[in-house]
Amino acid sequence: MANQGKKPTRRSERALAFQVLYGLSFTPATSEGALRAAYAASPDVADRNAEDEKADRQAPATAPQGYAWEVIHGVWKTQAELDEAVSGFSQNWRVERMGRVELTLLRIAVYEMLFRDDVPAKVAMNEAIELSKQFGDDNSRGFINGILDAVARAVESGRLTPKGQ
């Protein structure tokens, strides 16, 4: 039986998604195959796959799965829309000028707010702020909180919705 360990938490899955997406901010994936390769190359995913192979040597290779992959794939597919939303709520900051850590965390949280009905806006905000403590600097939290608070209010009021909906 594959992977008998504990199921990863949403927070650990978000951290994995952050790490993969942050890496992609330096070398963007131009195809879904490249995105899958970046995900598979992540040390956490490679470790999981090694554990799975030990547990079941006959198991066929499976497609990426889990919350981290859903977030990575979702952010990758909707990045232009996410950047437009972030830009619209960041006063005097173009996304091109934002730090990669902050922008990656903003993309993840805005993706969750817009496209994940199972994630309340306040949870997406809190998780981004918690991850900023781990990966960002002292100024990251305030910057991220300010933008995400405005995005959350716009989503809750219906002023910001996913395109095509």
Curated annotation (Swiss-Prot):
Keywords: RNA-binding, Transcription, Transcription antitermination, Transcription regulation. It comes from the Bacteria. Pfam families: NusB. One of its GO terms (biological process) is transcription antitermination. GO terms for molecular function: RNA binding. GO terms for cellular component: cytosol. InterPro entries: NusB-like_sf, NusB_fam, NusB_RsmB_TIM44. Involved in transcription antitermination. Required for transcription of ribosomal RNA (rRNA) genes. Binds specifically to the boxA antiterminator sequence of the ribosomal RNA (rrn) operons. HAMAP family: NusB. Belongs to the NusB family. NCBIfam families: nusB (TIGR01951). This is Transcription antitermination protein NusB. The lineage of its organism: Bacteria, Pseudomonadati, Thermodesulfobacteriota, Desulfovibrionia, Desulfovibrionales.
